[in-house]
Amino acid sequence: MNHICPTVTALDVHAYREQLELVSSFAPRIHIDLMDGDFAPTASPNPDLLWIPEGVEVDIHVMYRNPDAILERLISLKPSLIIVHAESNADIPKLASTLRNHGIKTGIALLPETSAEDVRYVLPHTQHALIFGGHLGYHGGQADLSQLAKAEELLKAQRQLELGWDGGANLENLDELIRAGISVINVGSAIHKTDNPETTYATMKAKVTPV
């Protein structure tokens, strides 16, 4: 199944609430970005101030240099999936074991400079790989579709891996993302910056749903 996941990328609690209430009103699966202001150039609110809605599948994308610093808090939020960066200081096999004990899936995110080969050793510990084709901590920007070359390599290394895409997804490039093997497409400004985000979401969802 292919998923369109509206993203929540907020720099303050007010924006977080606004974005979260909007996208969770129409999308069954959403993607929340958390930034530390160090690994990522922008900073999201303190995770202690955040919450996630019931009845919605939530992926949390942790753009932190030290994800362990907030791991306990994230686990308490009970998301479906926590994604950490290959470039972070996380001990991913250990982190994955902790998450598994709490019934939470583990994802690994790859910045453009990180190859599929670089993360091959952690793939047996993960259920999801996020190919990053945008800019850390911001909505908007162009998708670097050259990063899609990683999709085939990742799936060759682990056939059951769920592949996600983050960065510049829109109606024009959805087909190319799906053809490359991406099944979870995280969408920011292409939904948030339209006159009717719910209608745009429905249009995108229909485009990636097989007839």
Place the predicted regions along the sequence by residue.
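Conserved N-terminal beta1-alpha1 strand-loop-helix module at the mouth
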Residues: 1-83, 87-91, 98-100, 105-106, ...
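Generic beta-sheet signal
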Residues: 7, 61, 109, 132, ...
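Active-site/ligand-binding-proximal alpha/beta "capping" segment
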Residues: 130, 134-135, 141-184, 190
